[in-house]
Amino acid sequence: MSTIRLIVGLGNPGPEYAATRHNAGAWFTDQAARREHATPRLESKFFGLYARSGELHFVWPQTYMNASGKSVAAVARFYKILPEEILVVHDELDLPPGSARFKKGGGHGGHNGLRDIHSALGTPDYWRLRLGIGHPGDKSQVAHFVLKPPRSEEQTLIDIAIGHALDTLPDVLRGDFPAAMKTLHTAAK
């Protein structure tokens, strides 16, 4: 059972994107870093914001979503972090707002941030926390949808799911994903 040593909060940089659905991963990671008393700072060698609490590292890529792998791979190489010790937190179109699910490995499901991380790490075998943002219903609307803020009621549901996911952090950091999954997948129904 590997422990998690790196939490990655996916999103796009800049204030114009901070409140958009695509930044749900960054919202979770902001709160997780605060809980661990880790303060982010810009770190150019990691192409993003970086924070550390003991052996736990956090990164928020500032490369835009499509190039997130550059940041993740830089931290992983520098600190010799294995893919199975990485938790990537991201928005998930295939889950409704209020849902959150852990998953290890698998495809990128069209998510460009995950696609780039797969490529940069050379494997899809890292942990993910998928935060449901819902789907616009029409595939042609996805790009527009993820770059807009959620409606108020959706934001409330996403915030609740993030809270439930944060409650699993002690299990996650120990690498006890069966316990974390049981807690989260039960709470987020």
Curated annotation (Swiss-Prot):
On assembly, the entry states: Monomer.
Species, as recorded: Laribacter hongkongensis (strain HLHK9)
Question: What are the residue positions of the site described as Stabilizes the basic form of H active site to accept a proton?
Answer: 91
Q: Which Gene3D superfamilies match?
A: Peptidyl-tRNA hydrolase
Q: Where in the cell is it found?
A: Cytoplasm
MF-aspect GO terms = peptidyl-tRNA hydrolase activity; tRNA binding
State the reactions this protein catalyses: an N-acyl-L-alpha-aminoacyl-tRNA + H2O = an N-acyl-L-amino acid + a tRNA + H(+)
The positions annotated as site (Discriminates between blocked and unblocked aminoacyl-tRNA) read 12
What InterPro entries does UniProt report for this protein, alphabetically?
A: Pept_tRNA_hydro, Pept_tRNA_hydro_CS, Pept_tRNA_hydro_sf
UniProt xrefs under CDD domains: PTH
Q: Where does tRNA bind?
A: 17, 64, 66, 112
Q: Which GO terms describe its biological process?
A: protein quality control for misfolded or incompletely synthesized proteins; rescue of stalled ribosome
Protein's name in the database: Peptidyl-tRNA hydrolase
Residues of the active site are 22
For this record, the Gene Ontology CC terms, alphabetical, are: cytoplasm
